[in-house]
Amino acid sequence: MDKSIVLNICGVKSLGGLKVVNSAINTISESEYQLIILHNNNLTEPIDTDSNIIKIETSLKRFFHPFLNIFLSRKDITTINNSDAILHFGNFGFKTKNKSYTLIQNLLPLEIKDFKNIILKYFINKSFKQSDYIVYQLDHVAEKINIRFKSKLMKIGIIDKGEKDLNTEIGVIGIMSKTRNKNSNFMEEVLKRVSVDSPEYKITKFISTENQKHSEKNLISLSEQYPKHNIYFHASFYETVGLPLYEASSAGLFIVAPDSEYMMYFDNSNSIKYKPEDIESATRCIKDALNSNKKTIQSLHYKEDWNLVLESI
């Protein structure tokens, strides 16, 4: 196997990010390319199970990741530069001599103008400038990317539709997290009101974690919860995809989520959209969904087509 591709996953830490990495690994592992994974020393999944994958590990913190071409060993940077391509996950990477791709996975630096996100946006734009392609998943993300990079854009996200029976077990499930973007305080208040007004309905608050060591257990636990509910409540401010929305829809749940850009792919056949940050609106939409006589939904299933990347190398 003479051809190789590097996946730089040093910036990946969320469950959603790990799922995207797994999707890429599964496709590339079946191709003609030798897979090389560059990761930090905190990552325990998903790379420890395949002995055919070449692994390069760094202990450098996130601040150094845009400069890994300087701080990695000569052996490691030579291995990377000798590969056919590198795909940077987590919004930005570092300069290399091969064909490079940057996958945008976090919209916050493009939306929020605090000190941290201004710095991140600088590195993102620098990575976009250095990259041959900017890879994105869904169309609303492309609208956030500076127009001077439009010629580099490559879309890999696909949404499939299909009719599915709505789950018969009645209840509401929402995912909460310490991450500010997940808007968990708002979700907590809305679900509290629903439980007070309608105590007969089951309310489940699933606590997500950024700890990768427990990610597989988390994913299994969440997938087991979906069939026990018929309503999925979402509250995030921003999403590049919002994987739980599609997982819940595919699992037979009706979606209640804010009327935000990332919800543009859903309609009234599979969702109710509430006014963002409006507790009364969200509470009313959940109650309307619970009292609906709907039996089937037009479910949405999300996936990535990594062959588009491979074909462009």
Task: Name what the model sees in each region.
Residues 33-89, 214-215:
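Active-site donor-binding segments of glycosyltransferases and PAPS-dependent sulfotransferases
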Residues 75, 115-134:
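Membrane-proximal helix-turn-helix segments that form the acceptor-binding/catalytic region
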Residues 85-115:
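Active-site proximal beta-strand in glycosyltransferases
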Residues 129-151:
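A short, active-site helix/loop in glycosyltransferases that binds the activated sugar's phosphate group
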Residues 169-211:
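Conserved catalytic-core segment of nucleotide-activated headgroup transferases in glycan assembly
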Residues 237, 249:
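Aromatic "clamp/platform" in nucleotide-sugar-dependent glycosyltransferases that forms part
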Residues 254-257:
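Short hydrophobic beta-strand element within catalytic cores of glycosyltransferases
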Residues 277, 284, 290-313:
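A charged, aromatic-enriched C-terminal amphipathic alpha-helix characteristic of glycosyltransferases
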